[in-house]
Amino acid sequence: MIFKVGDTVVYPHHGAALVEAIETRTIKGEQKEYLVLKVAQGDLTVRVPAENAEYVGVRDVVGQEGLDKVFQVLRAPHTEEPTNWSRRYKANLEKLASGDVNKVAEVVRDLWRRDQERGLSAGEKRMLAKARQILVGELALAESTDDAKAETILDEVLAAAS
């Protein structure tokens, strides 16, 4: 996949990002192109070797079809999850690291429902906040709206599904 300056992409763990520049760096005598990504949430800039962009999970923002699938995931019935906190946390961490928007939606759905039913530990609350931030950023881009509106959409879908 070829990215150009000005493209909006999604970077795993951080969500939506703008390709701010493409720079050439010399490392061990070899010139390589790097994508300079400015993450939408917070003040973070990430440099990714262009040849490894897909490998690390950099991808385009979901389209309408992808958005419909995300909403299906959010509305899906509750899935059985490990009762052991550490196993559940690790499984959710792996889903977030995958960079797959549907897996991020699963984490948001499952933690949100667990929070409604039993409450969450501090670690899971932070994870839910991070997963929501990633999902809201992508929803805002996919719907061409701001984060506040995307958050409202997410809350409505979650509330309607429970």
UniProtKB/Swiss-Prot annotation:
Effect of residue 25 to E: Weakens interaction with RpoB. Abolishes interaction with RpoB
Gene3D superfamilies the record matches: 2.40.10.170, CarD-like, C-terminal domain
Keywords per UniProt: Virulence
Pfam families tied to this protein: CarD_C, CarD_TRCF_RID
GO biological process, one term: rRNA transcription
Effect of a null allele: Essential for growth, it cannot be disrupted.
UniProt function note: Controls rRNA transcription by binding to the RNA polymerase (RNAP). Required for replication and persistence during infection of mice.
Family per similarity comment: Belongs to the CarD family.
Complex and partners: Interacts directly with the N-terminus of the RNA polymerase subunit beta (RpoB).
Protein name per Swiss-Prot or TrEMBL: RNA polymerase-binding transcription factor CarD
The organism of origin for this protein: Mycobacterium tuberculosis (strain ATCC 25618 / H37Rv)
Gene from which this protein is expressed: carD
